[in-house]
């Protein structure tokens, strides 16, 4: 069995914090599946296909990473991908409580699914997709927080 991990998220948009975690996971695991969740209830800026394409662009240099969109329960996606490890990032102590609850629910639904938590590099510890969108909305420079392709995509969305 290969060492396959899923890194799920909405990735609206994918940030440098996400890509840092993906790159680090790619060094630890044989295969990393970036699972881009549909999450229509979150009212994303980018639709699912756009988020998948942006995530593919920023991870194209990582040969053992694939990006797949999904809907429904994460545990069903994990089974479909034949993965039994889930990776999640913890930016702050406040993230831990929520992630701990999710890990326990996922374990209850799929006992063989293990959750592994990674902390971000210090320079990425405060970056979130929500903050990036907020800074962009108010005309701030987001180039230090996202890949140039993502910054361009956000700018294009704003001019529509």
UniProtKB/Swiss-Prot annotation:
The record marks 18 as: Transition state stabilizer. GO terms for biological process: coenzyme A biosynthetic process. Pathway: Cofactor biosynthesis; coenzyme A biosynthesis; CoA from (R)-pantothenate: step 4/5. Substrate binds at residues 10, 42, 74, 88. It comes from the Bacteria. Homohexamer. PANTHER family: PHOSPHOPANTETHEINE ADENYLYLTRANSFERASE. This is Phosphopantetheine adenylyltransferase. The gene is coaD.
